[in-house]
Amino acid sequence: MATLSDGLFDDMSVLGVIGYVLEQTRFIFLVPILKRLVNLCQVVSVLLFVDAAYMAIVVAIVKLLGRTPQKVLKWESFKSDDIELAPSSNHPMVLIQIPIFNEKEVCQLSIGAACKLSWPLDRMIIQVLDDSTEEESQKLVRLECKKWESEGITIKSEVRGGFREGFKAGALTAGMKHSYVDEYKCEFVVIFDADFQPEPDFLERTVPFLVHNPEIALVQAGWKYGNADECCMTRIQEMSLNYHFAVEQKSGSSILGFFGFNGTAGVWRIKALNEAEGWKDRTIVEDMDLAVRAYLRGSKFVYVDDVKVKNELPSSFQAYRFQQHRWSCGPANLFKKIAMEIIKNQNVSLWKKVYLIYNFFFLRKIVVHIFTFVFYCVILPATVIFPEIEVPKWTTIYIPATITILNAIATPKSFYLILYWILFENVMAMHRSIGTLIGLLETSRVKEWIVTQKLGESNNLRENLIFPDHYSFPERLRWREIMVGMYLFICGYYDFVFGRTYLYVYLFLQSIAFFVVGVGYVGMPVPSTPVQTSE
């Protein structure tokens, strides 16, 4: 074996030696490592495809056979179509909880919609759980509650005095502890977030499932969005959420009677909620935590896709990013805390345990986020610099195209936005990956809770917030997105000059997407200091 003393590098410059070392490093270390990573990503890609295909097939079969919840389960409306003529004794006692935290733009909407529900007035209690610290928000809530109380509605405004222990879970728990909940013998509890506006017949269409099917613990309604057409970002959110409800929630409800509770627009059987030990604030996804624990005790859930509740999508990127952090960090952290509980549980079958651990948590809450960013934004771009590594088309084109089409079908009107959806979702995958890792590693932001900013239906408010004077260009810059965009652009340029494929087309487009987000030109530019409380 040649050494330096043999004269191998005698005629080489320093740059030549460095080049030789780099070339050897490339062949001995980088190429083998990258090949293994590509192979691993191919396996993960197949697993995600199988899971997506499974859910799509289930939904297709359910639709073809017409197996709606009303046909599969016992469902009977209450005796009289006229709520004023129907004996109130036919209707169970319902508690409606509306947790609020400094949401003055929307709180009146949700309170008003809840008070207009078609249900005997003596058979429902509306409980406004106001943890607000802003005086204006507190005043609006008090006035709205007094207004409806004067019209004969049983409505309670409960304030914890700025002591927001446990965030939303803490507020819901505190609400259940009030003596009148037991005195009125409430059987079911409905949760609406502050921006949710149910239709008057919401209870009439959901509660019968619980009344006539004692094994059902939760009825989850779908969502519809009042501001979906506000900007491209809200349209993309609508596409993702429509897929979540139409495919993920519906398939879980149809096969196993399980899905993750969405935290709002749902009706719980109070007995089942209490048997599952109620709300816990150990993570920032108290809704999913409760759903898993209730399911492990034998409860079943039903998703009713023909009942939808209007709400508002976050229209600024900042608000959306904070929301996605909570939705990615929380499930990963919950998985870490509850995995052993699932394994040791004796009430559910092995198949259900596998589904919870592998499909529900591992694939859909952890792997999908990390894989999407790492493969499509890190590993795949790197392969253009290593021509020795070939990535098959089924990994880069066929599988992702199929999964993308399955997502887009849920929102036909936005199908033409499919390219924007792909590029934006890859950008968001970076934030979701960070959130997932924070949840798994339990770093400092693991209990970070930032209320998603909503603007309500005030056009004046929206106009005033669109282009504020203090929102300068440097304030918009997001350096993580810019750095990833530069990496993708460099890889794309290298492939354009030296490559033999057309991967540079994707790389240039994806780099542009990262740059656009990086300079703050996505969503409605509504800068503000977010309301944040973290432990």
From Swiss-Prot:
One of its GO terms (cellular component) is Golgi membrane. It is a multi-pass membrane protein. The active site is at D131, D287. Its EC number is 2.4.1.32. It is an enzyme of class 2 (transferase). Keywords: Cell wall biogenesis/degradation, Glycosyltransferase, Golgi apparatus, Membrane, Transferase, Transmembrane, Transmembrane helix. It catalyses: GDP-mannose + (glucomannan)n = GDP + (glucomannan)n+1. InterPro entries: Glyco_trans_2-like, Nucleotide-diphossugar_trans. The chain crosses the membrane at residues 42-62, 366-386, 403-423, 482-502, 503-523. Substrate binds at D193, D195. GO terms for molecular function: glucomannan 4-beta-mannosyltransferase activity. It is found in: Golgi apparatus membrane. GO terms for biological process: cell wall organization. Probable mannan synthase which consists of a 4-beta-mannosyltransferase activity on mannan using GDP-mannose. The beta-1,4-mannan product is the backbone for galactomannan synthesis by galactomannan galactosyltransferase. Galactomannan is a noncellulosic polysaccharides of plant cell wall. Belongs to the glycosyltransferase 2 family. Plant cellulose synthase-like A subfamily. This is Probable glucomannan 4-beta-mannosyltransferase 14. It comes from Arabidopsis thaliana.
